[in-house]
């Protein structure tokens, strides 16, 4: 395990990113080559986007490597470490999918169940004709990116919103990325298991995955590790409460813990069988939009893929605009030479996670500023492709 901690060298030229795709310097130690590769990918992006602090964690053939840059808080001067807690925004959806995968493999629900089967309050609404799979994969018919401002974190208001909602498209026909969609999926998964979502995550999911630095509500004892997020105007920001926030974007975690989650996804067989099956259930693709195959929480691409196409799959239009889907004839295993990824943001934080099962390779990038997805993907792509060019990631046999 390697933990490299140092300040952001903000004077470094953006052109040094090219180092990430050049051969290693002869005689340089492997750890130094990896550090140089990550430095060259990260530092220009930090400078260009005025990112106070950033953490990278890489799983390379089962070995974790950590790289920490800058400040967790500009106010008190705390530096980023692998244990610093970041808000991960929509990367939380992959944890929600894991809980749902557990409910599926325990036969508490099926993806073709109607949503109203698991919440009687929705009976008689449009959710009589919307499946759990539609909710999980953003194809319910046009649920929006966010709840309206008028809907607060109140079950009655949330229920009333869903009861009156009317679809714009036929369920199962168009993808429109949506917190209310996958949020309801997570809520219904918890209902099928007979416990509140938050309790299931904190008491079952996180412990089963070996995560001790992952929280929905950061406990007082861990507050000193919680990074301060920063908005576009450099104002300190942290995520506030919202409807189905835990299900959609509520997880706070460290680079070290999130890498453990990535490792669990790379090697589900190392977990207890119910949780191995739960993770496997999230690694199934149901339809394509362009190059992207939609799984449960995860979005997948054939690997290798060009940087431009990977950025397009994680672009603003993919998040904000509807896209007609191409349904797969049967669920497709997202394994082998595929890159599974997820972006996540809150107003003050930006996250990106990616892994390639067939290369036994994964990485985590966490920052305390919400900066463009294209920049996060650029960092990851430089590291992943650089490692391949250095011959670090042969095919997993």
Swiss-Prot record:
This protein's UniProt keywords: Antibiotic resistance, Hydrolase, Periplasm, Signal
EC number from the UniProt entry: 3.5.2.6
Active site feature: 90, 177
Binding site for a beta-lactam: 90, 146, 177, 179, 370
Chief location category: periplasm
Catalytic reaction equation(s): a beta-lactam + H2O = a substituted beta-amino acid
NCBIfam families: bla_class_C, blaPDC
Protein's name in the database: Beta-lactamase
């Amino acid at each position: 395990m390697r933990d490299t901690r140092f300040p952001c060298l903000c004077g470094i030229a953006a052109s040094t990113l090219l180092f990430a795709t050049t051969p290693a310097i002869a005689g340089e130690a492997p750890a130094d080559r990896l550090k140089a590769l990550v430095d060259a990918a990260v530092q220009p992006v930090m400078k260009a986007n005025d990112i106070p602090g950033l953490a990278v964690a890489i799983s390379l053939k089962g070995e974790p490597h950590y790289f920490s840059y800058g400040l967790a808080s500009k106010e008190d001067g705390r530096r980023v470490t692998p244990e610093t807690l970041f808000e991960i925004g929509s990367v939380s959806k992959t944890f929600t999918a894991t809980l749902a995968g557990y409910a599926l493999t325990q036969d508490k629900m099926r993806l073709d169940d109607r949503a109203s089967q698991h919440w009687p309050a929705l009976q008689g609404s449009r959710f009589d004709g919307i499946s759990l799979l539609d909710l999980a994969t953003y194809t319910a018919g046009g649920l929006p990116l966010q709840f309206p401002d008028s809907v607060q974190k109140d079950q009655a208001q949330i229920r009333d919103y869903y009861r009156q909602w009317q679809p714009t498209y036929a369920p199962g026909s168009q993808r429109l990325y949506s917190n209310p969609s996958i949020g309801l999926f997570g809520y219904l998964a918890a209902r099928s298991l007979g416990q509140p979502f938050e309790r299931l995550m904190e008491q079952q999911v996180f412990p089963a995955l070996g995560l001790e630095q992952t929280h929905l509500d950061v406990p007082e004892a861990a507050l000193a590790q919680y990074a301060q997020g920063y908005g576009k105007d450099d104002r300190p920001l942290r995520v506030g409460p919202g409807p189905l926030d835990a299900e959609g974007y509520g997880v706070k975690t460290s680079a070290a813990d999130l890498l453990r989650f990535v490792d669990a996804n790379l090697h589900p067989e190392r977990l207890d069988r119910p949780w191995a099956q739960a993770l496997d259930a999230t690694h199934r693709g149901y339809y394509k939009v362009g190059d992207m195959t939609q799984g449960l929480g995860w979005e997948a691409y054939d690997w290798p893929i060009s940087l431009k196409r990977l950025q397009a799959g994680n672009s603003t239009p993919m998040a904000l605009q509807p896209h007609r889907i191409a349904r797969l004839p049967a669920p497709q295993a997202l394994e082998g030479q595929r890159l599974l990824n997820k972006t996540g943001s809150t107003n003050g934080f930006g996250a990106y996670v990616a892994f390639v099962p067939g290369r036994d390779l994964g990485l985590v990038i966490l920052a305390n500023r919400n900066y463009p997805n294209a920049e996060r993907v650029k960092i990851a792509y430089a590291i992943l492709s650089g490692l391949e060019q250095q011959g670090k990631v042969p095919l997993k046999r």
